[in-house]
Each structure stands twice: as C-alpha cells, then as structure tokens.
Amino acid sequence: MKQFAITLSVLCALILLVPTLLVIPFQHNKEAGASVESEKTAVSTKPASKGAETLKASPVSIPVYRTANQSVENIPLEEYVIGVVASEMPATFKPEALKAQALAARTFIVRLMVSNSAVEAPKGSLVDDTQMFQVYKSKAELKKQWGTSYETKLKKITDAVASTQGKILTYNNQPIEASFFSTSNGYTENAEAYWTSAIPYLKSVKSPWDKKSPKYKATKTFTAAEFQQKLGVKLDGSSAVGKITGETPGHQVATAVINGKTLKGRDIREKLGLNSADFEWKRNGDTITVTTRGFGHGVGMSQYGANFMAKEGKTVDDIVKYYYQGTQISEADAFLNKYMAKK
C-alpha cells in the first residue's frame, strides 16, 4: 500500500512536470522568432541609401528661356537638373554615371548663377533650353518622349539627382567649368587645345573605355565640290586631300594643310559637321571620305567613358575626380545664397 502511494505520487509529479518541459522549447523558439523579427524591422527602418533619397524642394529657381513657346519659365533648381540629366545622358546608363552627370549639370548652372556667362541668354533668363547652355526638357516633354517607360526612367534619374542634391564640383573653392561630351577618341582634350585658355582641371586623360561606345567611329562622304566650298579651299590635281601637320594633347588634329592653306582642326570639324576633330581623310576621284573617332569636343567628362567606368564598379567620386583632375565635391549653399542676395 505504501509502495502504491509512492508510485501514485511520482505519476502526479510527472503529470505536472511534462507540460512545463514541453512549453520551455516553444517559449525559446518564440523568443528567437521575436529576435529575428526585430532584426528584420531594424533593417527595413535603416535610413535610405544615397541613391534612394527623397528629392527636397529647391529654395532657388532657374529662369529658363523655353524656345518652343518663347517664354521664360522659373524652374526649381533640382527639377531643372533632372530635366538636364534626362536630356543630356541616356536614362539607360548606370546610376553612378547618372550621378556624375547630375553633378556636372548642377555645377554648370551654379557657376553661371555666380559669374558672368560668355554667352548671353534671352532677356529675363539665365539660360535657354538648348545645347548653347544645357539641353532641358520638362516632365511633360519627357513623358511624350519616353512613353510607357516614363515612370521607370524618371525614377532612375530622380534618384541620381537626389543622391547628389546640393552638391557641386569645385576647384580652389569655386564652381568649375563642368564641360562634358559624348565619346572620346581614347583621350580627353586639354581645354586650351579647343578653346582659348588653359584650365588646370581640364587636362587630357586616357579614356580607353570609349572605344566600346557606339559613337566611337563614324564616316562622312563629300563630293570634291562640297568639300572645297565648305572649307574655302582648292584641291590640287593629286589623289591627296591634304596633310595633317599638328596634333593636340588629346590626339586630335590641331592643324592641317590643304593645297598650301593651313586650317585648324576644330574649324575643319565645325565646317564639315564632323563628329570630332580626330579625323583622317581619303580621296577617291571626286569623292572624299572622312573617318572620325570620338563624338564631341573632347573636353571634360566623357559620358560613355563615365558609363563604362560605372559598369566596372567605379563610383561617382571616382568618375568625376578622374575626368576633372584635382576637383572636390562641395556644398552649393554658399553660392546659392550669393545668387539669392543679388536678386
């Protein structure tokens, strides 16, 4: 009887203990689950990356002359930069290249805001919307151009602009001449080789990526009569066109002689409407074929070079500091305040 009582006591104890033993593992798993959940929440509430920043309202507006309707439109600075980047660089380019273009576009306009432009804009405006300054298109124009891909492309460009908002490129604490072009011949050009003055941060650098650009090579054909008329020269009776007599630091044509007349490479390019001043020519009877390498003046940042750099994993800092040697990325506030004070 005593043994039965002991056995009964043990069974009762086990009955009370088993639920507790069963619950302990589940409580542990529940706590672990809560831990995982809190980690997920922490990740999802991290500050957005630079590329996903929200575009802030611009306190400064740019008076832009819209050539289509011949009127001046005041456009918030960052909205203007979006319209320029969308117009000047393909939206299919890599985000880091788009960021570099945003920095260049913002720097260009901020520099104009605080200094005198060599090119006069229409009355009441700071710039127009053409390549005379920077090409700009409104969101309505971009929607018409892009169609069904409008939302995707606009978001990509807006993210690039937002990630660089308020930032410009400076040299000696001043906004730089942030020139850019489509495709180099494998080298960028010294500023003084294309314009008149040397600029320390616009020096020739290698840009080997550009050889992969669809705009790297092109040909253009002229009749002998067209060629002579456009350049104001007289071809001799030989099979030769002329002789290249000088080369720039960027390996473009500096000078050429045609039947005793010396011409600048830039003038030849502009008068013949060539893609670049790196050219060679060939005469076949009454036909002259000119082959060019590169697209644009070659000074500053190569857009296709920037995109290929981005594809290799280079950042916006890498890109702009490579093409604009010795420059810094700085806040634009001081220059914007100076502009507002003048108004």
Curated annotation (Swiss-Prot):
A Pfam match: SpoIID
Keyword Zinc-finger: no
Keyword terms: Sporulation
Record-annotated disulphide pairs: none
Biological process, per Gene Ontology: sporulation resulting in formation of a cellular spore
Function summary: May act at the level of sigma-G activity or its stability. SpoIID is probably required for engulfment.
Protein name: Stage II sporulation protein D
Biological source species: Bacillus subtilis (strain 168)
